[in-house]
């Protein structure tokens, strides 16, 4: 068996094409969606990530609002910038790029973001709405990576209603919120959340119809632990030593040989990552649509 690749790049391109049309419709009404980013310090990885966000914005017609602060910025200075973005009608969604410098209370910073402008979909208020609304339509920003995982599966007709889904990793960006989305009346999946305290992880994996690997442990999921035909999505990222070069390189949680037994595989890179970026833009556009009374 050779697994079907869940192509996140192609799916993200389709999402962006749809967003481009929706942004054009908003512009005809005099509404221009805007993404704000708050970057503190000069970390090259963070700066590159933020630049990528704004390139994505340019593709679909979203305005860019960039706030850059030195690594010496105080808690109060960062909070002041957040307050300005909250009040700025040109900004329909924004993110605070993590990590923040040592000494900054990141949780306090993130909690001050207006929930309606929470482009990451991870504000406590928005996660609370996911807990409370099992059947009702969600009218607030959704967590980007979990939403991207589900979108990618549905686009490839992977059945989720009643499916056994095993999520490995309990981080706030993927592991914890994805269960809230998957156990809603739709998609209606059954979710097991595994982590470092899980006994006999392999037995959980072997029963799964869908595996979402988000632990940050290189090669954690191998073909011996995957049920034939299962869908396996690699969302984990860690650094390992490349024996060929002696340098570190990025690695996912899923071993390459999983493709020999799985029915579907979302590789890393190229799988869920592009969808995460595209759905961040979706949150920004949907916020603008709600503000314009279109949702």
From Swiss-Prot:
Q: In which pathway does it act?
A: One-carbon metabolism; tetrahydrofolate interconversion
Keywords, comma-separated and alphabetical: Amino-acid biosynthesis, Histidine biosynthesis, Hydrolase, Methionine biosynthesis, Multifunctional enzyme, NADP, One-carbon metabolism, Oxidoreductase, Purine biosynthesis
The record's EC number reads 1.5.1.5, 3.5.4.9
GO molecular-function annotation terms? methenyltetrahydrofolate cyclohydrolase activity; methylenetetrahydrofolate dehydrogenase (NADP+) activity
Q: Name one Pfam family in it.
A: THF_DHG_CYH
PANTHER family from the UniProt entry: C-1-TETRAHYDROFOLATE SYNTHASE, CYTOPLASMIC (PTHR48099:SF5), C-1-TETRAHYDROFOLATE SYNTHASE, CYTOPLASMIC-RELATED (PTHR48099)
What's the protein called, per UniProt? Bifunctional protein FolD
- Source organism: Kineococcus radiotolerans (strain ATCC BAA-149 / DSM 14245 / SRS30216)
Q: What gene is this protein translated from?
A: folD
């Amino acid at each position: 068996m050779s697994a079907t690749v869940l192509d996140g790049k192609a799916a993200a391109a389709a999402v962006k094409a749809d967003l481009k049309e929706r942004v054009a419709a908003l512009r005809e009404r005099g509404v221009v969606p805007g993404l704000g980013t708050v970057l503190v310090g000069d970390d090259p990885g963070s700066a590159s990530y933020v630049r990528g966000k704004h390139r994505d914005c340019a593709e679909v017609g979203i305005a860019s609002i960039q706030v850059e602060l030195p690594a010496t910025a105080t808690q109060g200075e960062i909070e002041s910038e957040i307050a300005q973005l909250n009040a700025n009608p040109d900004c329909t969604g924004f993110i605070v790029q993590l990590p923040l410098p040592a000494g900054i209370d990141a949780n306090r910073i993130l909690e001050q973001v207006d929930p309606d402008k929470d482009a990451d979909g991870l504000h406590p208020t928005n996660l609370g709405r996911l807990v409370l609304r099992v059947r009702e339509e969600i009218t607030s920003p959704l967590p980007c990576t979990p939403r991207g995982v589900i979108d990618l599966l549905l686009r490839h007709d992977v059945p989720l209603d009643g499916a056994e889904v095993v999520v490995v990793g309990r981080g706030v960006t993927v592991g914890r919120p994805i269960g809230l989305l998957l156990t809603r009346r739709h998609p209606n999946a059954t979710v097991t959340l595994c982590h470092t305290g899980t006994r006999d992880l392999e037995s959980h994996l072997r029963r799964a119809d869908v595996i979402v690997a988000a632990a940050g442990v290189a090669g954690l999921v191998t073909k011996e632990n995957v049920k034939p035909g299962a869908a396996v999505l690699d969302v984990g990222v860690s650094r390992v030593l490349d024996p060929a070069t002696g340098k570190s390189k990025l690695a996912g949680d899923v071993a390459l040989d999983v493709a020999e037994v799985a029915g579907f595989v979302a590789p890393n890179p190229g799988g869920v990552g592009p969808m995460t970026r595209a759905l961040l833009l979706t949150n920004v556009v949907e916020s603008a649509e709600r503000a314009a009374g279109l949702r």
